């Protein structure tokens, strides 16, 4: 009897775990695209930005960095900008969820940009933009870019860090 109870408990636990995973996957369509994020400074980080189409509309943008994790809570600010990474005037299109230094991950649902325009998967694929993740939210470390990458229509542009422009935290 105790053996049957263990199997029943194990089966229920697996059903709950698998059920939670499928619920999460049900929020997406099959459309997604990943963009590489290049090191933007002497800090040893690279990454990947993955955009997924949401069934309810809009997109989820997930940033995953590769590099040194922290054991302390700290968050790297991340932004989606209009224009390519080397555009001299590239205003912020959307503040993204900060990257947690402990997990090196961030997720943001985007349905509308700061300018009021609607964002969906098809628009993101042709969006003239780029992503930057900063070392700090303000102060001198704000100008330190951990990773940078073009997205949407700019995805095939090669990154040349000498041409990277800084961004204003208040340019939206």
Please place each PLM-identified region on the residue numbering:
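N-terminal leader/targeting pre-sequences
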Residues: 21-77, 82-172
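Bacterial N-terminal signal peptides that target proteins for export
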Residues: 1-9
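C-terminal motif of bacterial Sec signal peptides marking the signal peptidase cleavage site
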Residues: 16-19
